[in-house]
Curated annotation (Swiss-Prot):
GO cellular component term, pick one: extracellular region
Tissues expressing this chain: Expressed by the venom duct.
Localization, UniProt: Secreted
Signal peptide annotation: none
The record's account of how the chain is modified after translation: Contains 3 disulfide bonds.
Matching Gene3D superfamilies: Trypsin-like serine proteases
Organism: Bombus terrestris
Protein name: Venom protease
Keyword Protease: yes
């Protein structure tokens, strides 16, 4: 869980946002 969002549900959005 990253930023309070399950990786399975928000993987790409936060990965792209964080630069991963």
């Amino acid at each position: 869980v990253v930023g309070g969002k399950p990786a399975k549900l928000g993987a790409w959005p936060w990965m792209v946002a964080l630069g991963f």
